[in-house]
A protein has these predicted regions:
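Membrane-embedded transmembrane alpha-helical bundles that form the catalytic cores
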Residues: 1-173
Length: 173
């Protein structure tokens, strides 16, 4: 990946163009959110501008968000080729539905994070139409959701101390 990126940068320089930075030392990131801000900036920006924000961003889940969640679950169920994957997804959706039905706080939390998860899953699907890449996207989305959940209560939130930066860097890697 780095090789053909370097070739593209070199050819652009030979032609007199200056390309934007696409990777900004992501492995020096102090948290998961910072990692994704630094990693593959052109793709991340495209996913944010043309997928995440039109679906509602972190403010709300739209009809499109939930429709896309259904499509992704259907797609994953079909390519998994096993009976238990749709059953697991059905149970997961039932738990989310019941939680949102009986708790307005949980519903707001789901609405705020469904678009983030969908964007990461679809970003994984963009890398390859296999279950491995979809799971990779889902795990990264889950990491971002967990980070958003715990960043305000984290004892390592103060990045002015060297040991907090070290802990954040270690957890991110």
């Amino acid at each position: 990946f780095s090789g053909y990126t370097d070739i593209a940068i070199g050819i652009a320089m030979l032609l007199g163009f200056s390309l934007n930075i696409n990777f900004n030392s992501p492995y020096k990131a102090l948290n998961v959110s910072d990692f994704w801000r630094r990693w593959h900036i052109s793709l991340s920006t495209w996913l944010r501008d043309y997928l995440y924000i039109p679906m509602g961003g972190n403010r709300s889940g739209s009809f499109f968000s939930y429709f896309m969640m259904f499509i992704v679950i259907l797609f994953v169920s079909l390519i998994a080729q096993s009976w238990y994957v749709p059953v697991i997804f059905a149970g997961f959706v039932l738990v989310i539905f019941l939680g949102a039905r009986f708790s307005s706080t949980f519903k707001r939390w789901i609405d705020a994070n469904v678009n983030l998860m969908l964007t990461m899953v679809l970003g994984g699907l963009w890398h390859g139409a296999s279950l491995n890449f979809i799971v990779w996207g889902a795990l990264n989305g889950f990491g971002l959701v967990v980070y958003k959940l715990f960043k305000n209560i984290s004892p390592w939130g103060d990045k002015s101390k060297w040991y907090n930066r070290t802990i954040g860097l270690t957890i991110t890697l």
